[in-house]
């Protein structure tokens, strides 16, 4: 929308309490790695870290009238230096409580990627008083544009009628957003309509700050006493689930590669070992072959002793025999070593040793990794689809259907069908009231019946009317 810097603080529109809307609003602010989730069960533990909570509650007109009265409360933090060192902004711009609640969480966390706009705002408002921080929020064009881009078209028309501070749904009542964040080991409640931030105290050493928050909210909502007001909404600002799922998927795939390589290496070593065992068996069968070769060569030498040309040959054979015998001796030594190193095999246990696995264990582990990878990929797909649906719902929420409806009704009127449709609609609405029409008709019959009763003195169906007619005939005979 076009930005008028002179009237920037006058045009903020009210927003719905929807986690998808708040998540998209974070993206428009330039924040990365953060999303908003709705909390349905306050007593259920929340998985993973939580940056803060956003609480939507009913703001009654009576409370709104008393908001200017500064209450003396023990949980108020009135130290000016302490208040200015945290990001607490008073809401001076109407209908900006949704953005205030988000900024109260984001700008009080040090491990969030705020982006350029919010980083500049955080540096600019450092050390400011709460009122000036509120004006700084209202006069930031990027925040105003992002805020109003997610408002319904009805909010613009409703803004002219309702000039209250927070969002209104009907006369005398509105809904307001506040934030709960952990700051310096204490649970703080940041409400832009209050003059000071509220410190609910530290949490225990062996508990998380979310446990402290649940206790505070249970007491406020009356859950612990059974007097619960169901007209509230609770959302949590958490890290983007897709980042954790993507990291988990990467680790699973890395482990899958490692296990596959280990399994392949183990199978390769098994194949090498089986080949060596086959060689040992072959050596067992050929243990007597050196003796046979020596006898054959000796006979050959005896046959050729008388021949002078057989000498070199004998020398070559001797060398060959010596070579074979030496090689045979080496092979036998190797065989004895193999026999000593490899005793008769025993049934392999599940775990051969510390940190080692059998092929069966590796196959089972690889199967579990593949199953976990499929589940994690489905979770990532679900998160991406949910983020896509956030955008679809936002388009449906912010689209102005007035032009379409007016054009559609004009076309029906031009074709002469609008009157018939309106008549059918009116007849359909009258059908549930047919019982009252019949009752009114029956009351009319009663009125006519009463007239006859008044004229004749009694009902014509009663025995007295018959006697009256009899008396009349008797009088006529006289």
Swiss-Prot record:
Its EC number is 3.4.19.12. The record marks 91 as: Transition state stabilizer. It is found in: Nucleus. Belongs to the peptidase C12 family. BAP1 subfamily. This is Ubiquitin carboxyl-terminal hydrolase calypso. Keywords: Chromatin regulator, Hydrolase, Nucleus, Protease, Thiol protease, Ubl conjugation pathway. Catalytic component of the polycomb repressive deubiquitinase (PR-DUB) complex, a complex that specifically mediates deubiquitination of histone H2A monoubiquitinated at 'Lys-119' (H2AK118ub1). Mediates bisymmetric organization of the PR-DUB complex and is involved in association with nucleosomes to mediate deubiquitination. Does not deubiquitinate monoubiquitinated histone H2B. Required to maintain the transcriptionally repressive state of homeotic genes throughout development. The PR-DUB complex has weak or no activity toward 'Lys-48'- and 'Lys-63'-linked polyubiquitin chains. The active site is at residues 97, 176. One of its GO terms (molecular function) is chromatin binding. Its main location: nucleus. Residues 464-478 have a biased composition (Basic residues). GO terms for biological process: epigenetic regulation of gene expression; heterochromatin formation; protein deubiquitination; ubiquitin-dependent protein catabolic process. PANTHER family: UBIQUITIN CARBOXYL-TERMINAL HYDROLASE (PTHR10589), UBIQUITIN CARBOXYL-TERMINAL HYDROLASE BAP1 (PTHR10589:SF28). It comes from Aedes aegypti. It catalyses: Thiol-dependent hydrolysis of ester, thioester, amide, peptide and isopeptide bonds formed by the C-terminal Gly of ubiquitin (a 76-residue protein attached to proteins as an intracellular targeting signal). Residues 430-478 are annotated as: Positively charged C-terminal tail required for binding nucleosomes.
């Amino acid at each position: 929308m076009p930005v008028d810097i002179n009237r920037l603080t006058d045009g903020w529109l009210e927003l719905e309490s929807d986690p998808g809307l708040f998540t998209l609003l974070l993206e428009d602010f330039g924040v990365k790695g953060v999303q908003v989730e709705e909390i349905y069960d306050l007593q259920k533990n929340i998985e993973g870290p939580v940056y803060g909570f956003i609480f939507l509650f009913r703001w009654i007109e009576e409370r709104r009238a008393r908001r200017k009265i500064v209450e003396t409360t023990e949980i108020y933090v009135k130290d000016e230096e302490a208040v200015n060192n945290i990001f607490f902004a008073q809401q001076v711009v109407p209908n900006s409580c949704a953005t205030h609640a988000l900024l109260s969480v984001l700008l009080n966390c040090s491990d969030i990627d705020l982006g350029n706009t919010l980083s500049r705002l955080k540096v600019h408002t450092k050390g400011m008083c709460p009122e000036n921080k509120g004006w700084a929020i209202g006069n930031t064009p990027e925040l105003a544009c992002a805020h109003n881009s997610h408002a319904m078209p009805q909010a613009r028309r409703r803004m002219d009628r309702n000039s209250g501070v927070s969002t209104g749904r009907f006369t005398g009542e509105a809904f307001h957003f506040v934030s709960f964040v952990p700051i310096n080991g204490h649970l703080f409640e940041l409400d832009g309509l209050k003059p000071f931030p509220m410190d609910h105290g530290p949490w225990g050493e062996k508990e998380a700050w979310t446990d402290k928050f649940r206790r505070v909210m249970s007491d406020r909502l009356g859950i612990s006493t059974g007097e619960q007001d169901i007209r509230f909404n609770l959302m949590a600002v958490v890290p983007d689930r897709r980042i954790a799922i993507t990291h988990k998927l990467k680790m699973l795939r890395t482990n899958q590669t490692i296990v596959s390589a280990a399994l392949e290496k183990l199978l390769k070593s098994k194949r090498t070992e089986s080949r060596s065992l086959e060689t040992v068996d072959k050596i067992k069968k050929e243990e007597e072959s050196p003796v046979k070769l020596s006898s054959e060569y000796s006979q050959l030498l005896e046959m050729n002793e008388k021949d002078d040309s057989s000498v070199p040959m004998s020398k070559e054979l001797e060398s060959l025999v010596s070579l074979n015998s030496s090689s045979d001796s080496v092979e036998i030594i190797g065989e004895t070593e193999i026999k000593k190193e490899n005793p008769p095999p025993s049934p392999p246990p599940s775990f051969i040793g510390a940190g080692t696995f059998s092929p069966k264990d590796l196959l089972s582990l690889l199967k579990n990794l593949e199953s976990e990878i499929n589940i994690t990929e489905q979770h990532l797909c679900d998160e991406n689809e949910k983020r896509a649906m956030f955008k679809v719902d936002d388009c449906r929420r912010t689209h102005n259907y007035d032009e379409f409806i007016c054009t559609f009704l004009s076309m029906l009127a031009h074709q002469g069908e609008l009157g018939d449709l309106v008549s059918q609609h009116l007849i359909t609405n009258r059908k549930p009231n047919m019982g009252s029409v019949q009752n009114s008709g029956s009351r009319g019959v009663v009125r006519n019946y009463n007239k006859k009763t008044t004229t004749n003195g009694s009902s014509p169906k009663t025995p007295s009317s018959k006697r009256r007619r009899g008396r009349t005939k008797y009088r006529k005979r006289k």
